[in-house]
């Protein structure tokens, strides 16, 4: 039965997570159910309980490596528990967006994860996962090469839809990528150059946050080994006002709450920091403004609470 014909259809959304994932499933009429994250990935106790008890839950979003925005790498146990899920809905699917599969900032700390396709096959769930990746953050944003991996049965199904959407891929672009990279070693060498650009930016943000906020007990943030983001938590109720104050001083952030379904962070505390685009001078200034904004907003909240 097509999902569009299922009343009260639902989709699991690990959060903090990727706002565009949430927007896609919301656009298609899914009810979005947040799933808390921990240091190993989504809380699998919650995932297992939900999918085993509700056949209107049709899927879950996952970014298994350097997850956006927390930079978490799913543990082997988490991945194996995903592969061994026993969903009540027989058409339940894991949307495994491996967007940052080669995006390490520290090459010597590269973390390999189990292949979800193989794990699902071994667990007797070969059709349960779609895995995606692209070169959008490797070569050309929005115009690189993309790929999907799944079971033979799923790929036949996907091709059946794709043939009506497009005559075929851009084969010249495919050839361009193959000739440039040649093999996985070529991709890794290229990504090491990306890492050399990004690493100083991430380290500059982390240093300033430590200099300005460490030990105050008013914030915590991640120091990822890869990916594109730093996840920052204020005290409860301070994120929106912090982003607003930063905006008034010329520093723009993704809206507070964007990392949660419907843009609703129930604690109003998570902010996604993206140090990748700006130059080093602007990054340092913006981070100092951000840290100052966190202090001001937090102090105002604490004063008002004490009054």
Located regions from the model:
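Conserved core of the PLP fold type I
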Residues: 1-90, 101-124, 291, 296-306
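Conserved core segment of the aminotransferase class I/II
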Residues: 118-199, 299
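PLP-dependent enzyme catalytic core of the Aspartate aminotransferase-like
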Residues: 125, 248, 262-307
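Helix N-cap motif at beta-to-alpha junctions
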Residues: 235-239, 278-280
């Amino acid at each position: 039965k097509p999902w569009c014909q299922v009343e009260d259809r639902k989709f699991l959304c690990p959060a903090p997570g990727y706002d565009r994932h949430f927007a896609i499933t919301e656009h298609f009429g899914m009810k979005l159910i947040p799933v808390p994250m921990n240091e190993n990935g989504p809380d699998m106790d919650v995932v297992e309980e939900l999918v085993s008890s509700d056949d209107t839950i049709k899927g879950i979003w996952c970014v298994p490596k350097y997850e956006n925005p927390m930079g978490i790498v799913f543990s082997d146990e988490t991945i194996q528990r995903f592969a061994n899920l026993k969903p009540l809905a027989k058409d339940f699917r894991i949307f495994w967006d491996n967007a940052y599969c080669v995006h390490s900032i520290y090459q010597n700390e590269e973390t390999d994860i189990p292949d979800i396709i193989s794990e699902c096959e071994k667990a007797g769930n070969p059709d349960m996962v779609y895995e995606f990746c692209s070169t959008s953050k490797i070569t050309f944003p929005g115009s690189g090469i993309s790929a999907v991996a799944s079971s033979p049965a799923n790929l036949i199904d996907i091709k059946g839809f794709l043939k009506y959407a497009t005559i075929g891929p851009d084969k010249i672009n495919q050839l361009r990528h193959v000739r440039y990279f040649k093999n996985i070693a070529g991709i890794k060498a290229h990504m090491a150059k990306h890492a050399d650009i990004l690493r100083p930016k991430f380290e500059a943000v982390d240093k300033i946050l430590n200099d300005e906020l460490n030990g105050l007990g008013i914030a915590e943030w991640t120091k990822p080994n890869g990916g594109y983001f730093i996840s920052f938590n204020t005290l409860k109720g301070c994120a929106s006002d912090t982003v607003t104050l930063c905006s008034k001083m010329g520093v723009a952030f993704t809206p507070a709450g964007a990392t949660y379904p419907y843009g609703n962070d129930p604690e109003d505390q998570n902010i996604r920091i993206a140090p990748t685009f700006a130059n080093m001078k602007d990054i340092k200034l913006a981070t100092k403004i951000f840290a100052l904004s966190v202090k001001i907003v937090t102090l105002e909240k604490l004063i008002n609470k004490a009054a």
